């Protein structure tokens, strides 16, 4: 009689290392909380301590429950994909999306009806506005990018995600950063830098998470079984790497003390403004553009069951975008103390960006060649194609607004808000919704979303909301700009500032209505996601196959 010996279970170096690191972090956080200069900072230190202690217990419990052998890279010769972090990231994206849209509706109502501030500092416009932008960009958008990148890189590489605990650290660590940043805004902890409000300790935590994200993604690409690196992975890598550089450069700061939330940025004056908008514009360029173009290059061909229209054009699109986008930041600082040559440089590169941007748009739209009927029959395809159309519109409007003569009218007005939201709602949100509608059935092995009719409703309700929103802001912005520059025959300003504010009121109300409709659409999506996971018909095999590279 033969005896089969099972290998002895041993804790991996990663498990042991993380337990020790988080135990030390928990102890250090308790010390910081006890000596913190402010109660708000002490609250954050206690959050770090609680999260660290919980992580130690979770890793220990996971070790006790797992078999001696770590999950294999392949099963019966097929890749053993690690989709659990992708599932969590996708659901968190839905949650944060609704939260961010809800906060946006609240601050839109505050703009139209200031009584909605309720004289409470924690929910005043000044604190909710950065909470809204961070929730929709970094919480919703960031989770979409992390989840889809982990899915796409595995499928196109035919390889399991690199690392055992590292993918979980990326997903959960990133969302812990969102919690720290968001609660910090409500408590008044901020650097005062747009899109980079979190203070030094949150930035430091995000740096650790982001480096891990880069290593997991790159490690998966390096161990790929496919000789070809699919173009979507190029865009993901550019987004991850460039955001890391931008984050480090713009958040270079010296803390007052380890016991204080306050820090001082190493840049000052006009140099600080330039670095801020080098970061701010390229957060748009690489977080909200390059990252989501990766979604376009994977999910539209997958859903349409067609290859990318021109793979060569996608490579040209990639390199042109990467080279040009990084120079366009100064167009945010027209008519300021920034040297005129730098303003002109930013304007020039912004105009040049129009061509590669539209090259990508054409590539995305023409991928549907031979499958245009799906625009009528498939609301998910329709949503993603409309997203690409909004991308084209926003990338024409942006270069146009960067021209100094146009910018003299549009700068500091609601036109800029309309432009941002045509890209954020029309491009980023719609391509994200399309990706989520694709991912949910694939991840949970469902035949299709629970209700295609609900997706139709989501599309039309949200589209009406977007149209109301951006049209109201376009009209408001142009009206604002014209009223500000209107003079009487004697050379006096024709309108007082309060008159320009009063003229905005009906347009602010329309914006709030548009936001409510967009939020309603996202709630329909959340219901559909829940019903798909719990009620929809299950299939025996996962329906999302790897995407073969197009030629």
Curated annotation (Swiss-Prot):
Pathway the protein acts in: Energy metabolism; oxidative phosphorylation
Amino-acid positions noted as binding Cu cation in the UniProt annotation, renumbered to this chain: 281, 331-332
Alphabetic keyword roster: Cell membrane, Copper, Electron transport, Heme, Iron, Membrane, Metal-binding, Respiratory chain, Translocase, Transmembrane, Transmembrane helix, Transport
Binding of heme b 2; high-spin, residues: 419
Pfam families in UniProt: COX1
Compartment(s): Cell membrane
GO-annotated biological processes: electron transport coupled proton transport; oxidative phosphorylation; respiratory electron transport chain
UniProt remark on cofactor binding: Binds 1 copper ion per subunit, denoted as copper B. Binds 2 heme b groups per subunit, denoted as high- and low-spin.
Membrane-traversing stretches: 14-34, 40-60, 88-108, 133-153, 169-189, 202-222, 229-249, 280-300, 313-333, 345-365, 383-403, 424-444, 459-479, 513-533
Cofactor(s) listed: Cu(2+); heme b
Membrane topology term: Multi-pass membrane protein
Signal peptide start and end residues: none
PANTHER family associated with the record: CYTOCHROME C OXIDASE SUBUNIT 1, CYTOCHROME C OXIDASE SUBUNIT 1 HOMOLOG, BACTEROID
Function: Cytochrome c oxidase is the component of the respiratory chain that catalyzes the reduction of oxygen to water. Subunits 1-3 form the functional core of the enzyme complex. Co I is the catalytic subunit of the enzyme. Electrons originating in cytochrome c or a quinol are transferred to the bimetallic center formed by a high-spin heme and copper B.
Entry protein name: Cytochrome c oxidase subunit 1 homolog
Gene of this entry: fixN
